[in-house]
């Protein structure tokens, strides 16, 4: 494991938090501004040191050309989610897809294998890989990954005006709307759909 100076660790932490918040790495100028460096060149020197130690990879010629090693193996592919387990639990990961997380915006934290045709009319088909950004912050109309009790589902999100009821809307008339009463249901938002990958037709 690489050993970092305090300042290098601060730069690395900033890169990670910026990617998590925005989906892409910071520029040299943004790093310099947030950490109080005199210039972007000072940030560049810290980035080069981090790259030498293997903490990051630098992509030449790009203002945001910074990659974290953990993103290089690709995005975790989640198959069936075992009841009660966190989505990214090791036993749920079937594989890694060789697509950089920042291919999507916001960045994808995992790919979820779609089961069924309830979202057909939104262009999401059985067997598709849904790119998901881990967040609990969603708005009406977003396509979300939601957990109800121990079941995980992909639906369009709608919060009723009373704020006590959530509707999860299918995009296929053959499927029923799921209505969730937040006062007595174990419900959570696991993530936001940010794209799909279709491996075969």
From Swiss-Prot:
- Residues at the site labelled Cleavage: 83-84
The UniProt keywords, alphabetically, are: Autocatalytic cleavage, DNA damage, DNA repair, DNA replication, DNA-binding, Hydrolase, Repressor, SOS response, Transcription, Transcription regulation
Which reaction is the catalytic activity of this chain? Hydrolysis of Ala-|-Gly bond in repressor LexA
Catalytic residues, per the record, are: 118 (for autocatalytic cleavage activity), 155 (for autocatalytic cleavage activity)
Disulphide bonds annotated for this chain are: none
GO MF annotations in UniProt: DNA binding; serine-type endopeptidase activity
Q: Which residues bind DNA?
A: 28-48
Gene Ontology terms: biological process: DNA repair; DNA replication; negative regulation of DNA-templated transcription; proteolysis; SOS response
Q: Indicate yes or no for the key word Hydrolase.
A: yes
Q: Which EC numbers characterise this protein's activity in its record? A: 3.4.21.88
- PANTHER family, A to Z: LEXA REPRESSOR (PTHR33516), LEXA REPRESSOR-RELATED (PTHR33516:SF2)
Q: How does it assemble?
A: Homodimer.
Cited HAMAP family: LexA (MF_00015)
Role description? Represses a number of genes involved in the response to DNA damage (SOS response), including recA and lexA. In the presence of single-stranded DNA, RecA interacts with LexA causing an autocatalytic cleavage which disrupts the DNA-binding part of LexA, leading to derepression of the SOS regulon and eventually DNA repair.
Family designation? Belongs to the peptidase S24 family.
Which NCBIfam families does its entry note? Answer: lexA
The protein's name is: LexA repressor
Species source reads Saccharophagus degradans (strain 2-40 / ATCC 43961 / DSM 17024)
Which gene produces this protein? lexA
């Amino acid at each position: 494991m690489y050993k970092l100076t305090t300042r290098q660790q601060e730069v690395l932490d900033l890169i990670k938090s910026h990617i998590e918040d925005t989906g892409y790495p910071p520029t040299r100028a943004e790093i310099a501004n947030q950490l109080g460096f005199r210039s972007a060149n000072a940030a560049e020197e810290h980035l080069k040191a981090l790259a030498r130690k293997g903490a990051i990879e630098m992509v030449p010629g790009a203002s945001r050309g910074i990659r974290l090693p953990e993103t290089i193996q690709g995005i975790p592919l989640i198959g069936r989610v075992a009841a009660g387990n966190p989505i990214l639990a090791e036993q749920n990961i079937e594989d890694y897809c060789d697509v950089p997380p920042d291919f999507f915006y916001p960045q994808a934290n995992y790919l979820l294998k779609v089961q069924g045709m309830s979202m057909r009319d939104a262009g999401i088909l059985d067997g598709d890989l849904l790119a998901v950004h881990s967040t609990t912050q969603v708005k009406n109309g977003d396509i979300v990954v939601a957990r109800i009790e121990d079941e995980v589902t992909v639906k369009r999100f709608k919060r009723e005006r009373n704020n006590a009821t959530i509707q999860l809307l299918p995009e296929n008339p053959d499927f029923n709307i799921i209505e969730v009463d937040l006062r007595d249901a174990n419900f959570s938002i696991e993530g936001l759909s940010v794209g799909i990958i279709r491996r075969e037709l």
